[in-house]
Amino acid sequence: MGIKGLTKLLADNAPKAMKEQKFESYFGRRIAVDASMSIYQFLIVVGRTGMETLTNEAGEVTSHLQGMFNRTIRLLEAGIKPVYVFDGKPPDLKKQELAKRYSKREDATKELTEAVEEGDKDAIEKFSKRTVKVTKQHNEECKRLLRLMGVPVVEAPCEAEAECAALCINDMVYAVASEDMDSLTFGAPRFLRHLMDPSSKKIPVMEFEVAKVLEELELTMDQFIDLCILSGCDYCDSIKGIGGQTALKLIRQHGSIESILENINKDRYQIPEDWPYQEARRLFKEPNVTLDIPELKWNAPDEEGLVEFLVKENGFNQDRVTKAIEKIKFAKNKSSQGRLESFFKPVVSTSVPLKRKDTSEKPTKAVANKKTKGAGGKKK
């Protein structure tokens, strides 16, 4: 979920902290990517029509591999150096949110069964997406694919978003790419949305700068964290009746959640029982992260390994995989120049004014009605 309604809140109250950028603006930049969020998007969009998805001969879904392969190649071709960060063990405080998600998937599964019995195609499309879950197997297969492509993988001890933010704070990467807005709450200096968008539409990258967010909102980082907790985060319930705008007003007026609780009208607003907002705050301020990771290197692709994994094991088209490998090799040679050219010629800003229509909080829900080009395997 990330932070409920934060994109709209920033668009309304801190528009200068947001700017649209072209994909190519990040040539030579190291970008930490929230892998699980990307895999989830690929499973929903790539090669999916109703309940049909891309599979290999064993009937195992390959949409995540197809999406990860194609999108990573596009990043490399643009001169971007992706670092994929995978989730570790979730914090205990997130168990309640994970239980809610499980319950919603169970409900969606029941609704899907009814839709299939009734032959309701729109409902099938709707509820089949809600049953999607990123599994350990999906993660492990994507790690294997990325390593074969020569792309670095980081395994976070806990939350991937927190690890991405830590890498960015410590100048190990330029920015963080995800769809979850809590990357900002973890303090990522630069945060990118839509970089990993898997739809066929060319959606501009939305870049946020946390320093400008704080400046525009006139808040400290501690106050911004409290604002996010009040708005609604993954770690605890929020106070019913308090949305983003009200939360911002209260934080500006009182300065902290503690002060708000002392002054709030408790007849109007019901405080959750044993509300663990302090622990949620601690998880944002002191997340379980590590900087003790192998040196980030972008190596030549393992050509034989990629053919073995994608073609022989997962039914991808060999000619397309071979051509894709050539793209990876060409992109590596191109990006090896880094951003050297930018030191010798002026760079024109590619940012464009913010368009409110692109401030949706949800991941892209576009449906791939046409067969994905270069798709591996078949549909089931």
Swiss-Prot record:
Biological processes annotated in GO: base-excision repair; DNA replication, removal of RNA primer
InterPro entries (alphabetical): 5-3_exonuclease, 5-3_exonuclease_C_sf, Flap_endonuc, HhH2, PIN-like_dom_sf, XPG-I_dom, XPG/Rad2, XPG_CS
Sequence positions that bind DNA: R71, E159, G232, D234
Record-linked PROSITE patterns: XPG_1 (PS00841), XPG_2 (PS00842)
Biased composition (Basic and acidic residues): 355-364
Cofactor note: Binds 2 magnesium ions per subunit. They probably participate in the reaction catalyzed by the enzyme. May bind an additional third magnesium ion after substrate binding.
EC number: 3.1.-.-
Cofactor dependency: Mg(2+)
Tissue-wise expression: Strongly expressed in proliferating tissues: root and shoot apical meristem, tiller bud, leaf, ligule primordia, marginal meristem of young leaves and panicles. Not expressed in mature leaves when exposed to UV.
Family matches, as CDD domains: H3TH_FEN1-Euk, PIN_FEN1
Listed Basic residues bias regions: 368-380
A matching Pfam family: XPG_I
UniProt keyword annotations, A-Z: DNA damage, DNA repair, DNA replication, Endonuclease, Exonuclease, Hydrolase, Magnesium, Metal-binding, Mitochondrion, Nuclease, Nucleus, Phosphoprotein
Processing after translation: Phosphorylated. Phosphorylation upon DNA damage induces relocalization to the nuclear plasma.
Region (I-domain): 123-254
Ways its activity is controlled: Inhibited by NaCl.
Annotated positions binding Mg(2+) 1: D34, D87, E159, E161
Name of the molecule in the record: Flap endonuclease 1-A
Lineage summary: Eukaryota, Viridiplantae, Streptophyta, Embryophyta, Tracheophyta
